[in-house]
Amino acid sequence: MMSWAAASLRMTAVPCFRVRCLGFRVGPWGASQHANPGCGAAPHRTLHVSATASAGHNKWSKVRHIKGPKDMERSRIFSKLTLSIRLAVKEGGPNPENNSSLANILELCRSKNMPKSTIESALKTEKNKGIYLLYEGRGPGGSSLLIEALSNSGPKCHLDIKYILNKNGGMMAEGARHFFDKKGVVVVGVEDREKKAVNLERALELAIEAGAEDVKEAEDEEEKNLFKFICDASSLHQVRKKLDSLGLCPVSCSMEFIPHSKVQLAEPELEQAAHLIQALNNYEDVIHVYDNIE
């Protein structure tokens, strides 16, 4: 596992756009279409660098991704991408030229080598009648969970997720949303277009230039090294375009719930949390599970 570090670019200006409630409907794979046009880059930006424990010594990084056989893992990834396509089509239509959220998720599908036939099937509008749902939960050790789902039956999905939580040491719990901020996330490879390696120091410089608030080293499901550039929701596509112009290779561009307050768990609770999140991810209607475990 690669070493993990993070650097935050603290903005001196108050952000123009912030998601505060569960009722705000934003698809997870693109920026809101109602961003404040008056938002601009902060006139002054201070860089704060903070080192954290390396992923190789972080217990949660070791146990959170419980993988089955490679073919099953690949199928699970495609299943989640299919749900994301359906949600993007439901909220913005099937034409990626007019639906930036859909364009973003299709870009991610291509990077994962998702079969064209699978993508075309997910794009069919008659299949996109589900309801977008966001559940708040509490996991082992007082951890907070946000569970995104797309379901044709809201009541059934609610009961099923409640059952999975209760069976695996969790529970439905209001208030989990307050531990997360909705942010734009641009994921890029660790090599630029000229196949030159990009280190964290260089990524920080590019983050400042692109107007990002934070950059983190990360890994995808296949343990490939990546950088995640985190920015205000209203500037997601602007930051992506700038990073692309600076020579980086964006893999995806999406909206995510980023925890601003994390909890540390003892090893038995970490194992229990990993099994809970795996059980939730295995449920067919779940798109993504976010946690605030450190």
Curated annotation (Swiss-Prot):
<dbReference type="GO" id="GO:0005739">
    <property type="term" value="C:mitochondrion"/>
</dbReference>
<dbReference type="GO" id="GO:0097177">
    <property type="term" value="F:mitochondrial ribosome binding"/>
</dbReference>
<dbReference type="GO" id="GO:0070129">
    <property type="term" value="P:regulation of mitochondrial translation"/>
</dbReference>
<dbReference type="InterPro" id="IPR029072">
    <property type="entry name" value="YebC-like"/>
</dbReference>
<dbReference type="Pfam" id="PF20772">
    <property type="entry name" value="TACO1_YebC_N"/>
</dbReference>
<comment type="similarity">
    <text>Belongs to the TACO1 family.</text>
</comment>
<dbReference type="InterPro" id="IPR002876">
    <property type="entry name" value="Transcrip_reg_TACO1-like"/>
</dbReference>
<feature type="coiled-coil region">
    <location>
        <begin position="190"/>
        <end position="224"/>
    </location>
</feature>
<keyword id="KW-0810">Translation regulation</keyword>
<dbReference type="GO" id="GO:0019843">
    <property type="term" value="F:rRNA binding"/>
</dbReference>
<dbReference type="GO" id="GO:0003729">
    <property type="term" value="F:mRNA binding"/>
</dbReference>
<dbReference type="InterPro" id="IPR026564">
    <property type="entry name" value="Transcrip_reg_TACO1-like_dom3"/>
</dbReference>
<protein>
    <recommendedName>
        <fullName>Translational activator of cytochrome c oxidase 1</fullName>
    </recommendedName>
</protein>
<dbReference type="InterPro" id="IPR017856">
    <property type="entry name" value="Integrase-like_N"/>
</dbReference>
<dbReference type="GO" id="GO:0033617">
    <property type="term" value="P:mitochondrial cytochrome c oxidase assembly"/>
</dbReference>
<keyword id="KW-0496">Mitochondrion</keyword>
<dbReference type="Pfam" id="PF01709">
    <property type="entry name" value="Transcrip_reg"/>
</dbReference>
<keyword id="KW-0010">Activator</keyword>
<dbReference type="InterPro" id="IPR048300">
    <property type="entry name" value="TACO1_YebC-like_2nd/3rd_dom"/>
</dbReference>
<dbReference type="InterPro" id="IPR049083">
    <property type="entry name" value="TACO1_YebC_N"/>
</dbReference>
<feature type="modified residue" description="N6-acetyllysine">
    <location>
        <position position="162"/>
    </location>
</feature>
<keyword id="KW-0175">Coiled coil</keyword>
<dbReference type="GO" id="GO:0061743">
    <property type="term" value="P:motor learning"/>
</dbReference>
<comment type="function">
    <text>Acts as a translational activator of mitochondrially-encoded cytochrome c oxidase 1.</text>
</comment>
<keyword id="KW-0007">Acetylation</keyword>
